[in-house]
């Protein structure tokens, strides 16, 4: 009973039910539209369907230890002294893959302005000889891919290691640039299914808004680039 009642007392669910009462009381189209938007983007069942699609169609890729190519770790900010959690997750993920592969001496290409903390974090995790190539690829993902396009051999298979919320854009850009590549995503809590219990269809969850915010930013960024890259060159500068 506690698990059923408790979610209704959270501020966002009090707002949801208050909004429903206001929509019923005043019968305004705008209130109903706001209620529908707030409910659909916050509902756990709806968000879990989106997570299932994304996890299976965008980032689900099984790594084969017999892989004989190289790896690319896209930078995730930081400074000369510190690494953000997203960078640590990507480096941990690529280290796990490197320690599985049968490739005798694979290469890891890391695109970041601050190479020293990335390399210092990665090297103790490695259990085999690895060729490390760290360089500043550019200010954005699009700059990084422009640099990678001219720097890497397109005939060598690649695994791109990035964060799950970044995987859609990376997979599309790798395909567009003609790389023989797959994407391995370091997981975050945002893309893990939320518990959808007895109160699921009557409440909203804040983590679902975070999910849709990240997906909106990811898809918007990529499709703006797709519409403009043919007649602009900002991503090359």
Where are these regions (language model features)?
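Short, Lys/Arg-enriched, disordered terminal segments
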Residues: 1-3, 103, 237
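Membrane-embedded alpha-helical segments of integral membrane proteins
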Residues: 1-24
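Hydrophobic membrane-insertion alpha-helices, especially the h-region
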Residues: 18-23, 28-44
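A structural signal for short, hydrophobic/glycine-enriched beta-strand patches
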Residues: 43-212
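Short, surface-exposed patches at the edges or C-terminal ends of soluble domains, predominantly
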Residues: 200-237
């Amino acid at each position: 009973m506690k698990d059923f009642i408790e979610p209704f007392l959270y501020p966002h669910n009090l707002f949801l039910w208050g909004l429903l009462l206001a929509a019923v009381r005043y019968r305004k189209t705008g209130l109903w539209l706001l209620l529908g938007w707030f409910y659909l983007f916050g509902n756990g069942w709806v968000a879990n369907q989106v997570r299932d699609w994304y996890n299976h169609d965008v980032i689900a890729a099984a790594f084969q230890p017999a892989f004989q190519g190289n790896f690319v770790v896209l930078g995730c900010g930081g400074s000369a002294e510190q690494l953000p959690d997203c960078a640590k997750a990507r480096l941990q993920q690529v280290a796990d893959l490197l320690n599985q592969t049968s490739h005798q001496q694979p290469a890891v290409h890391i695109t970041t302005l601050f190479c020293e903390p990335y390399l210092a974090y990665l090297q103790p995790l490695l259990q085999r000889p690895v060729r490390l190539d760290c360089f500043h690829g550019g200010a954005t993902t699009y700059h990084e891919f422009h640099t990678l396009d001219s720097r890497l051999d397109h005939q060598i298979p690649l695994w791109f290691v990035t964060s799950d919320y970044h995987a859609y854009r990376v997979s599309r850009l790798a395909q567009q640039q003609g790389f023989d590549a797959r994407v391995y995503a370091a997981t975050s809590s945002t893309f893990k299914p939320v518990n959808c219990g007895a109160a699921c269809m009557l409440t909203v969850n804040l983590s679902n808004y975070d999910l849709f915010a990240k997906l909106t930013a990811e898809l918007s960024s990529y499709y703006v680039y797709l519409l403009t890259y043919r007649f602009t060159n900002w991503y090359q500068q």
